[in-house]
Curated annotation (Swiss-Prot):
GO cellular component: cytoplasm
InterPro entries noted in UniProt: DnaJ (IPR012724), DnaJ_C (IPR002939), DnaJ_domain (IPR001623), DnaJ_domain_CS (IPR018253), HSP40/DnaJ_pept-bd (IPR008971), HSP_DnaJ_Cys-rich_dom (IPR001305), HSP_DnaJ_Cys-rich_dom_sf (IPR036410), J_dom_sf (IPR036869)
Stated family: Belongs to the DnaJ family.
Keyword Metal-binding on entry: yes
Quaternary structure (record): Homodimer.
Zinc finger (CR-type): 136-214
Record's protein name: Chaperone protein DnaJ
Keyword vocabulary terms for this entry: Chaperone, Cytoplasm, DNA replication, Metal-binding, Repeat, Stress response, Zinc, Zinc-finger
Segments annotated as CXXCXGXG motif repeats: 149-156, 166-173, 188-195, 202-209
Domain of life the protein comes from: Bacteria
């Protein structure tokens, strides 16, 4: 089945900005996250799909390759975009050996050598709250991975057993045959690609040198991270084959939606409703911040929508530097569900304002303008 276009997966058109990509991912990740759709295979697959698209389109090198070649850029032998659980560590290995087969000696005279494959990169998602994202936190996680066998220490052999170079492939792990100008390449059937023959395979790992294990890790998440950010833990991925280095663990951060605040980059936004008497008379209200309540005094004559900017009460970048702002939208709330007595009081108050434009300057100015407009039409 053909893979969907990454831009289409995120509901974007080709050429979308990085900001649009992040916004689309944040919205879709929140909707399809497995924690919110437990037991739904469809949501799990959708989450994997949008995360893969996000990983490629926010990496400038991968995005450039995808824009030019499409999914073909990441197929076997290509650059590799990685998957949901393991990203793969194979790369471009094998070209030097093919040229060595054809022209004898290769580039640098390395000859055939045992295949060494770096361990797979792994991925782990940690969903955190906005408070944790802004202030930083530590999370303990448990991952399941391939680790070096404790019994044979990665050799794949029982103690005292001989480990010899495979005589069939001479340690390369591959069998290549030349037919004219064409070269065929396949995994060695004798050693199954390891490049070695073990007299007595280790009973714990059955000769692989690696075993499946659960591993506990403590992850430090820096202050200022946002949805889609990744942390790379070097050498915490799967163990490599034949003593090769382990892969890396990529911790991907989704941030939960907050009940009060919305985030855009380094700035936080919230909406604060106030009663109309406070807007008319002035007074003090409590503004929410991530550090607690902050009391602010309001002057008289607040209009229905006002903005109050609290400098430095936003988010600090993970790279350091200044903090963003908290931008509060102060909205005057119209009272509802009034009693007859309350309605009568409001009508009495309204009557007391009749003919006094100084109390309603915008109202008077607007209708004066309307009157002049129609007067001019009649001339």
């Amino acid at each position: 089945m053909a893979k969907k276009d990454y831009y289409e997966v995120l509901g974007l058109s080709k050429g979308a900005s990085e900001k649009d990509i992040k916004r689309a991912y944040k919205r879709l990740a929140a909707k399809h996250h497995p924690d919110k759709n437990q037991g739904s295979k469809e949501s799990e697959e959708k989450f994997k799909e949008i995360t893969e698209a996000y990983d490629v389109l926010t990496d400038s090198e991968k995005k450039a390759m995808y824009d030019q070649y499409g999914h073909a850029a990441f197929e076997q032998g290509g650059a590799g975009a990685g998957g949901f659980g393991g990203f793969g560590g194979g790369g471009f290995g094998g070209f030097e050996d093919i040229f060595s087969e054809m022209f004898g000696g290769g580039f640098g005279g390395g000859g055939r050598r045992q295949r060494v494959v770096r361990g797979d990169d792994l991925r782990y998602d940690i969903e955190i709250t906005l408070e944790e994202a802004v202030k930083g936190c530590k999370k303990d996680i448990r991952i399941h991975t391939l680790a070096e066998c404790d019994t044979c220490h990665g050799t794949g052999a029982e103690a005292g057993s001989k480990v010899e170079t495979c005589s069939h492939c001479h340690g390369s792990g591959r069998i290549r045959r030349q037919q004219g100008f064409f070269v065929t390449d396949a995994v060695c059937p004798s050693c199954h690609g390891t490049g070695k023959r073990i007299e007595k395979p280790c009973r714990s790992c059955h000769g692989d040198g690696r075993v499946h294990k659960a591993k506990n890790l403590s992850v430090t998440i820096p202050a200022g991270v946002d949805t889609g950010n990744q942390l790379r833990l070097s050498r915490e991925g799967a163990a490599g084959e034949n003593g090769a280095p382990a892969g890396d663990l990529y911790v991907v951060i989704p941030v939960k939606e907050h009940d009060i605040f919305e985030r855009d980059g380094s700035n936080l936004y919230c909406e604060v409703p106030i009663i109309f008497t406070l807007a008319a008379l002035g007074g003090e209200i409590e503004m929410p911040t991530l550090d607690g309540q902050l009391k602010l005094k309001f002057r008289q004559k607040l209009q229905p929508v006002n903005y109050s900017v609290l400098r430095g009460k936003g988010v600090t970048s993970p790279r350091g530097g200044y903090a963003g702002d908290l931008i509060c939208k102060v909205v005057v709330e119209t009272p509802v569900n009034l009693t007859e007595e309350q309605k009568a009081l409001l009508r009495q108050f309204e009557e007391s304002l009749e003919g006094q434009g100084k109390h309603r300057p915008k109202h008077e100015g607007f209708f004066d303008g309307v009157k002049k407009f129609f007067d001019n039409l009649g001339k």
